[in-house]
């Protein structure tokens, strides 16, 4: 009879992107600051630095006193009410905060359950906008290498070839895709070539396109890849020319992760719709937000399609909104511990710490974008090997495909980042010729 958490988990619970019998490497027994307390199959305890910020969300670390206090206060009042026909202070305060800190013109807010759901709502919003304009446009233009979530609509705008959703191709709407945008260091000729392809595709299909959806300036789970701001700027222009809704998926990039508060602002553009998540609640509870321009909202509201047809049971959950208000306050309002000083400190430490990886023959690139550090190998990552090497160095990492990467919590000191980068370089080095691989999914 299984007794440990790991034994009881095995074959009972599915874990992300894995078979039922994959199980877990560790069970979690506690967490504080940038650390997670883990127990392995032998019962041994480990205290590891969370180099993943729990999939990029726990930016303030674990058991942050401001976050804990916000949730304790709210739960003493009420933990949940339906949002149909009712409102509450945490939701209104959060919406006001988000309108204030995001690029000008994003004046209306929809609070969703998760990042994927916010993308679903954004796609529906774009279709309703076109219907309100008297146009039956239902297709979307997206980028190869994109990742926008695992729900049905979101899957349809993820990379159609190299993505994770090939098994569901027959289920999904057929969308339009541009090649991966040029890298930030691309030549003027390479940028121009991509822009011409974008213009040609829009010229050919503009009458079908309800919206254009992008991860601004950095593609996350589709390959951990930054791209040239001219690509985003051109998509803003093309969306305007054909009156398509430009959707910026800032779920991963928002609140400073790429080195600016929002990647759209760094590129000098304002989307029609912006999706936010992950850092929004500091990883305490699931919540995402969609912000919409007054122009798009007004067109829908004054038409026969005036209701936005989406309403989750846990929409605007008060506990999640309280967490988000505390998180946004820490990220934006605190000049000493906000995102800007944190990312500046982390970025510098990542640059220094990952540089040795470039001496390895099987490393294609070691790249830093704001608070994101990535080592790309010329071969698939061995997940078990990477997990073992990283844990021996005191770090929890979760690599994928050819990438060993980190998005450290914003509370990370240079010493913490140094420990994380040493683990990444050691794990990368262990993939040298002669090793056997368990291919990452």
Which positions does each model-derived feature cover?
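Conserved N-terminal phosphate-binding loop of PLP-dependent enzymes in the Aspartate aminotransferase
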Residues: 1-441
